[in-house]
Every structure is written in structure tokens, then in C-alpha cells.
Amino acid sequence: MDRAKFIFVTGGVLSSLGKGISSSSIATLLQHCNYQVSILKIDPYINIDPGTMSPLEHGEVFVTSDGAETDLDIGHYERFLNRNLTRLNNFTTGQIFSSVIENERKGEYLGKTIQIVPHVTDEIKRRIKSAAKGLDFLIVEVGGTVGDMEGMFYLEAIRQLKLELGNEKVINVHVTLIPYIQTTNELKTKPTQHSVQELRRLGVTPQIILARSPKPLDKELKKKIALSCDVEQDSVIVATDTKSIYACPILFLQEGILTPIARRFNLNKLHPKMAAWNTLVEKIIAPKHKVKIGFVGKYLSLKESYKSLIEALIHAGAHLDTQVNIEWLDSENFNEKTDLEGVDAILVPGGFGERGIEGKICAIQRARLEKLPFLGICLGMQLAIVEFCRNVLGLKGANSTEFNQRCEYPVVYLIEDFMDQNHQKQVRTYNSPLGGTMRLGEYECEIMPNSLLEKAYKKPNIKERHRHRYEINPKYRQEWENKGLKVVGFGANHLIEAIELEDHPFFVGVQFHPEFTSRLQSPNPIILDFIKSALHKS
């Protein structure tokens, strides 16, 4: 931790300005200067983690290799940095409070009155320092907006850290909005000025202003912001909208963000090697080919629920010089008459609950019968089994016990005890609490030879991430396989991890979530081959 330098990223004016992408972009530039870099996300909500939050409330829950259910921004960090992060890279107010209360119960505070300062702020600082071990730089994104009640003690902890570590070890970057008033054709800086004033009132002074704006800022506006916010003019970085989030590091580099960073940290001039990155971004922005993927989901009112999967399709497309267009198909309304004209492949993602299930099953049946390339992920694979049992084997009562505990043919069921990734026995029942009771994190999968999965991964054993409670019931396996639906992937205790259909261009189901390991620089192999199959069909 001694060598680590810290860049804290806060947000002002309003939420959803792109602090996560900004943090990822800064980290990417520093990483391409051959530094050891990581990112930490602080979430100011009181939930322990987002695991039990509705996707429509929070967006996607991203699962790390060590089984943590985290904020979707952790997914951005992994995809930009092309490295695995852990539960150390995300914490919530709920976790902070739980730790402090647990320590108090153990008597670790020697009978003192427990207060926000110093006990809560000390726990925050401890976690930040712990995440910085072995690094040159730790970028810390603070969720929420300056002025929110929930974020006050995080800003206090940042103030204290800067005092403890010294100015040469800490930079504060404030992401803010420069709104454009169309009627007067003006960009307004007043919201930024007020946001910085509030931040400074709380004891934190920004050294870099990252100004989100729909239009470029001229020198006079930059000078005005610099003067009113007490930063140097080259520390006002304009972040206009880009055609791809992966173009943001290039934009920041062009805007000169590394100049104030190097100056503040007493570093030589920074020269990131971005040629390979630039090539991939060019293929995203101006691809030679196009495919259309029918995405059958039920959380379509907030597409951030499927963020990693959307990005995984973009990664595969970039490596195939292909624009992947998504045709959003609401599973609640999908039926045998739904128009699939121009759709090159069908994707059925993971999910929870009974709503929209029959529409997904119908989409799978059409992909099977119409020879459309198909990829089913987690629940998507489970429903492929249900569809096959109902419509090929004639088991009309086939279902998952998630939706009907008394179904006639429970082809998907709840395993009440299993070994977790640490080889510890876990027990779960239909009455178990929802939080943290799933099969979570990275597990090994043995791939059968001569399968589409082996062709994609090019090795007999892989590791992929899971997030589910229900498993495929092996009782009916022989009946499926006699009809051409083969099991091609096995996990520990012979759990069924992957299936594929014979005599079909591409019909694959996987119990794991391949999207969680896809990166711009290294797309997930099975998603890459899925897009290849769609491209061949188109």
C-alpha cells in the first residue's frame, strides 16, 4: 500500500453521469503505461449487496470470480482492465455498518461510544487501503451525488485519507454536468460551480474537473470553470458523448487528462500504448458486417439489467468486424406469430421468476425448429430442457420446480446440498433466505470432446461464473440424449453445465454466465462462436 496513489472519483449535479466509465477510462490509460492499477466502487446504499435487489431497481448484479454479488460498474472495470477483480473491489454502507456493529459486539472498541467519526470512517479507510495493496494506483469511485445524505461520511473519510497520505498521494476528480440550453444556444457552468462549492464545503477539493457536455467547450468556458473551481485550466477535461464507451480512454487522452495526473503525482510524462485498443474501437464504430440478434428478455424497461451480455456481444462483434444489432423481444408477449424476419439468431438470457417463461420457451422452440442459431444462458438453458421435454419427448407436464414445485416432470429442480467453490458443503431449501444462497462465482466445467463447446474454448476444462439456485435434473438425461440433445459439460458432482443439439447449426445451452468473463481484448469463446454462427446465417 505504501507505493499506492489514490484517485477518488466523485459526481455532482445529478446521477448517471458516467463515473464508472470515467474511472475505467483513467485506469485503462494508467494500465497501458505499465502501472499496476485497480478500481474500487463504493456504494452508499444500506443493502449488504445488490443480490436481492430487483434488476429494474438496480440494474445488473455482476458476479466476481470469488462469488461476490456486486455493482454493475465492477463489470465495466473488469472489461476495461481485462483482469479479474474480487469482493475487495466493492463495498456498501450495509457492509460497513455490519462490520462496525460486529466489532462492537466483539468488544474491539474497548467500550467506547460508537460514532460515524472515527469508527465508521476508520472502517472505510481500512477497506480502501486493503484494496490498494500491491498497486501503483487505486481509482476509487464514490457512488451517488455530492450532497446526498448517504455519501457524507465517505467524503469525510476521503478528506482524512488525503490528510494522512499527503497531497502527492491523492487526486480528487469531480465528474459534473455542463447542460446545454437549446433556446439560447448556451452551455451553462453554474451547476458545476455550485457542485464544487458543496464538495469543498465538505472538506474535499477537486484537482480535476471532468465536465460531461453534449458539445465541446471553448477556451473561455474552460477558463471560467478553472477559475471558479480553483483548478488549473488544463485540469478541466471535457467528456463529450462518444459512439462507444470504449472510445472514452482515447477521448480522455486527447483531452490531456494524464498531464495534471502526472504533475500532481510528480511523475514523468505518461505515454500509454493504445494502438491495439484503438484498432478494436475502430471495428466497433465502423464495422464491415452486421448481424441481428433476437434478445428474448423480461427486464426490457431497464436494459442495464443485461449490461454484461450486451457488452459481450459488442466484444465478439469487434473481433469479427461486425456490428451486433439487438432486436429486443419481450418474453411476456412472445408467441408463435412473433415476427423474426431478419433475425439471425436467438439469445435467451438468465433471469428469475415465472413472469415471461412461456414466451421464452416458445422462442426456444422456434429457434430449434427454424434452425436459428441459439444460445441459452442459465435460465435460458434450463428452459431449453423444459421445451425439449415437452415438445420432443412428449412430457407435457415438464417444468422447473422454481415455477411449480408439484409439476409432473421436474426436469429442473433445487439441489438441497452442494459443494461451494471453497469445497464447503452448503444446504439450501425452498425456505432458505434469498441473499447469498445461490451457487455463486467461478466453478470448473469439464467439456466433452468433439462438441461445439470444445471447438469454442479449445480445451477440455474451463472455469466460468455461476449465479443460480436450480439445476438440471439428470433423471431424464438418457431420454434427451436418445433424441439428440447431448450433455457436453459437467461440473463438480456431475452437475449438468452445458447442452447442445445435434443436427442444428448452433443450439447451445450453458448453466454458467459466459458474459461475466468477456472482455474487449478477449471476448468469451462461446459468445464469439454464437456470433460467428449468426454471421454465417446472415
UniProtKB/Swiss-Prot annotation:
GO terms for biological process: 'de novo' CTP biosynthetic process; pyrimidine nucleobase biosynthetic process. It catalyses: UTP + L-glutamine + ATP + H2O = CTP + L-glutamate + ADP + phosphate + 2 H(+); L-glutamine + H2O = L-glutamate + NH4(+); UTP + NH4(+) + ATP = CTP + ADP + phosphate + 2 H(+). Residues 292-538 form the Glutamine amidotransferase type-1 domain. InterPro entries: Class_I_gatase-like, CTP_synthase, CTP_synthase_N, GATASE, GATase1_CTP_Synthase, P-loop_NTPase. Its EC number is 6.3.4.2. CTPSs have evolved a hybrid strategy for distinguishing between UTP and CTP. The overlapping regions of the product feedback inhibitory and substrate sites recognize a common feature in both compounds, the triphosphate moiety. To differentiate isosteric substrate and product pyrimidine rings, an additional pocket far from the expected kinase/ligase catalytic site, specifically recognizes the cytosine and ribose portions of the product inhibitor. Catalyzes the ATP-dependent amination of UTP to CTP with either L-glutamine or ammonia as the source of nitrogen. Regulates intracellular CTP levels through interactions with the four ribonucleotide triphosphates. This is CTP synthase. It comes from Helicobacter pylori (strain J99 / ATCC 700824) (Campylobacter pylori J99). The gene is pyrG.
